Amino acid sequence: GKEGYPTDKRGCKLTCFFT
């Protein structure tokens, strides 16, 4: 997946991964 950001669709706080 890709790195997520505080404003991504997943609502990640710091860094998360999603596909």
From Swiss-Prot:
Top-level taxon in the UniProt lineage: Eukaryota
LCN-type CS-alpha/beta domain mapped to chain residues: 2-19
Gene Ontology terms, MF aspect: ion channel inhibitor activity
Entry keyword Secreted: yes
Expression (tissue specificity): Expressed by the venom gland.
Subcellular location: Secreted
Sorted UniProt keywords: Secreted
Any GO CC annotation of this UniProt entry: extracellular region
Family to which this protein belongs: Belongs to the long (4 C-C) scorpion toxin superfamily. Sodium channel inhibitor family. Alpha subfamily.
Primary role: Not toxic to mice.
Domain characteristics, as noted in the entry: Has the structural arrangement of an alpha-helix connected to antiparallel beta-sheets by disulfide bonds (CS-alpha/beta).
Protein name: Toxin Tb4
